A protein has these predicted regions:
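Cytosolic juxtamembrane N-terminal segment immediately preceding the first transmembrane helix
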Residues: 1-41
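Membrane-interfacial loop- and helix-cap regions that link adjacent transmembrane helices
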Residues: 24, 28, 41-47, 53-57, ...
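Glycine-rich segments within core transmembrane alpha-helices of 12-TM secondary carriers
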Residues: 63, 69, 140-193, 318-324, ...
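Conserved MFS/SLC helix-loop-helix module at the cytosolic interface between two early adjacent transmembrane helices
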Residues: 72-109
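Cytoplasmic membrane-interface "Motif A"-like loop-to-helix N-cap segments
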Residues: 82-95, 173, 334-351
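A membrane-interface helix-boundary motif in multi-pass transporters
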Residues: 86-91, 168-186, 420, 445-465
Length: 465
């Protein structure tokens, strides 16, 4: 046994053969694609909101239908279904639902049909995110599992940029063709699963070091780590079914799940909930009111090249936000150490301050009305920090729970330990979605109140949109 040390994340002291590095690259690429494709349809739908519903219909209904079914999947699935996870069936089910949902949006013009299609794609996205987070826990040693999860988080961040860019490119084709073309994207996921993703059993004997161990004298050592799940044929009972046998009839009861989830509430769920509640209140309720006069080329040469009308401000804030979310969600995959466990609430605290500062800037303003350049730079910095906080909260919460050791009471039972780890990472997934849902309800009165505050001080830009 190699000695445990305090610096858990380093693998530099190990000489990893090229074959193992190639496996890690394939694992990272696979999980990056899972995160990218699973989330990109969500972004495409939000980006296409103006084109999907009549002008008289509140665009918030798109945001609601795009998040509520995903929340149902994240809340219900881990608690209701029992037994081992059949990842192949899950992945094919999500692929078909996503593609079908986008086809319904593309082929039908009625608002009701389009909302049904958006709901199908949303449910699939929520279940898909849950599935890939759980899939990451089936890899061992912990450094391998963390590698996959880090790249999955990076892929979800990239989806924001990719989705907005894709819709920008295809929106000229119209909803029927543009959204119809996006319905083929979900098929990348099963192709990745079968043709690119290494099996968890391929890491059974590798020289990749586990998180928590290091030795300057070990080079190319072969460590017998048994992954918590192997091939699909080796799995026990399926979700919702029970098979006979001393090893295969393990399933967590509802009381077991309640016991497991209690310590996760304050450690992971509340920080995730609040960071997303504040974040999406900013995006949907505050950012639309952060408007300034169009910069003059004489005073602000660079800004005048970017901002041509007051309608350009909101897309600019969203571009800044999506870019910084991608960078921060990629922090672990590019080698930045994760936050210490006791600092996991920090991003949500900072996000709350950012919300207050941006609301103050919108309603009262930090600077004089003719100093729009300073105001724009300040908002740029605050929204960049907003995206960083949101991305760090997401990737660090799921990374930390992915790396947790099994409960001592179940460590001797590999099957039970596997199911507990899958449930724990799946059970906290609803926290971010519920934060977004509550934010969508809070954003409408927030936007109206800030616009009224602006008009009271003579700033009428929000009335001109």
């Amino acid at each position: 046994m190699l000695p445990a040390t305090s610096n858990l994340e380093s693998t530099e002291l190990f000489e990893i053969p090229e074959d193992d590095r190639k496996l890690m690259r394939k694992l990272g690429a696979s999980f990056f694609l899972f995160g990218l494709i699973n989330n990109v349809l969500y972004v495409i739908i939000l980006s296409a909101a103006l084109d999907l519903v009549p002008s008289s219909t509140p665009k918030g209904i798109i945001a609601f239908c795009n998040i509520a079914p995903a929340l149902v999947a994240k809340v219900g699935w881990p608690y209701v279904l029992k037994g081992r996870i059949r990842y192949v069936k899950r992945i094919f089910g999500c692929c078909i639902l996503s593609s079908l949902g986008m086809l319904v949006v593309a082929l039908f013009d009625s608002l009701f049909a389009r909302l049904i299609g958006i709901g199908l794609a949303s449910f699939s996205s929520g279940l898909g995110e849950l599935t890939f987070l759980q899939l990451s826990t089936t890899y061992a040693p912990p450094s391998v599992a963390g590698h996959g999860l880090g790249y999955f988080a990076s892929g979800t961040g990239a989806a924001g940029l990719a989705g907005a860019f894709l819709w920008w490119e295809v929106r000229g084709l119209g909803v029927r063709v543009g959204v119809g073309l996006s319905s083929v994207l979900p098929f990348i996921i099963p192709a990745t699963y079968f043709f690119l993703l290494p099996s968890s059993s391929t890491f059974l004997y590798t020289s990749i070091p586990p998180s928590g161990y290091e030795s300057p004298n070990v080079q190319g050592s072969t460590l017998p780590y048994t992954p918590l799940a192997a091939t699909e044929e080796e799995l026990g009972e399926e979700e919702g079914s029970f098979r006979a046998g001393p090893r295969k009839n393990v399933s967590l009861t509802f009381n077991d799940k309640v016991r497991l989830v209690r310590p996760l509430l304050t450690r992971y769920m509340l920080p995730l909930f609040f960071v997303y509640l504040f974040e999406y209140t900013i995006n949907q309720g505050v950012a639309p009111t952060l408007l300034y006069p169009v910069p003059s080329p004489d005073r602000y040469w660079l800004l005048s090249k970017i901002i041509h009308t007051i309608r350009d401000y909101y897309p600019l804030w969203q571009l800044i936000y999506q870019t910084t979310v991608f960078l921060s969600r990629s922090s672990i995959s590019i080698g930045i150490p994760p936050l210490p466990p006791n600092l996991l609430p920090l991003p949500s605290v900072l996000q709350g301050f950012i919300l207050l500062l941006l609301a103050f800037e919108s309603s009262i303003g930090f600077y004089a009305d003719d100093a729009e350049g300073l105001s724009i730079i300040t908002v740029f910095a605050l929204i960049s920090l907003e995206g960083i906080c949101g991305g760090l909260a997401y990737v660090n919460a799921f990374y930390r729970i992915n790396q947790e050791h099994p409960d001592p009471s179940s460590a001797h039972n590999m099957e039970r330990a596997k199911q507990e780890k899958e449930f724990k990472i799946g059970s906290i997934g609803f926290a971010d979605s519920s934060g977004i849902l509550f934010a969508s309800l809070l954003a409408v009165p927030t936007e109206l109140a800030l616009c009224k505050a602006q008009t009271r001080r003579g700033k009428m830009l929000c009335k001109e949109l």
